C-alpha cells in the first residue's frame, strides 16, 4: 500500500530491556543492522500492525512486552534512487512514512525468535546502548532514527523516575488461617506467661 506521495505506511519498533539497552537486529544475509519495522496492510490499524510485525520479525507477542509510547507524528525517509523499483504497473515507492513504538521487554529474552516465518527479516540480534543505532544505521534512515530516539529518551527518563511498585505476595485462605492460628497461640502463651508471673510474684510476697 503506497500513498499518493509515493510513501509506504510503515511501523517501527524499539524494544528496550530493564537496563535501558535496545534490541538491534541484523538483516538476513547482510551486514546491515536496524530496528524491526514493517508495512501496514490495507485496512489494518497501526497498533495491530505493530504487534503483527513484532511477532513476525522477533517472535514476541503482546503479553511479552509493555507499550511505553507511540510516536505522535508520521516520520518519513526517502530511499536512495538505486533502491527505488518499479515494474511499470505498480505505483513507485520512493520511501517510507513511519509511526514508531517504544516497547519494554517483560518476558525472558530467550523467547526472541527470528524464525517465525518462512522468510525471516533478520538472522541475528543483540542489545546495544540507547544512542548506538543513531550512529550506526544506514545514512538515509539516520534523521528519522535521531528524531525517534530523542522522543523516546524523554519517555525512558520519566519511566526511570517512577517509584518501583512491589506486588504483595498472594496469601491463600489456608495460609491466612495458619497465620491467625499462630497469632492466637502466641497471645495465649503471653497471657499464660503473665498469669504465671503474677502468681509467682504473689507467692514470693507471702
UniProtKB/Swiss-Prot annotation:
Record key words, sorted: Hydrolase
Major enzyme class: hydrolase
Q: Which Pfam families match?
A: NUDIX (PF00293)
Renumbered residue ranges of the record's region Disordered: 162-206
> Do you know which SUPFAM superfamilies this protein is assigned to?
Nudix
Q: Name one GO molecular function term.
A: mRNA 5'-diphosphatase activity
Q: One GO CC term of this entry?
A: cytoplasm
Q: Which PROSITE patterns match?
A: NUDIX, NUDIX_BOX
Which cofactor does this sequence's record say it needs? Answer: a divalent metal cation
One biological process term from GO is: mRNA catabolic process
Top-level lineage group: Bacteria
Looking at the record, the residues that make up the Nudix hydrolase domain are: 6-150
State the EC number(s): 3.6.1.-
Motif, Nudix box: chain positions: 38-59
Q: Give the matching CDD domains.
A: NUDIX_Ap4A_hydrolase_plant_like
Under InterPro entries, the record lists: Nudix_hydrolase, NUDIX_hydrolase-like_dom_sf, NUDIX_hydrolase_CS, NUDIX_hydrolase_dom, RppH
Specify residue ranges for compositional bias: Basic and acidic residues.
162-191
**Into which family does the record put it?**
Belongs to the Nudix hydrolase family. RppH subfamily.
Q: Which HAMAP family match?
A: Nudix_RppH
The record's function comment reads: Accelerates the degradation of transcripts by removing pyrophosphate from the 5'-end of triphosphorylated RNA, leading to a more labile monophosphorylated state that can stimulate subsequent ribonuclease cleavage.
> Which protein are we looking at?
RNA pyrophosphohydrolase
Q: What organism, scientifically named, is this protein from?
A: Actinobacillus pleuropneumoniae serotype 3 (strain JL03)
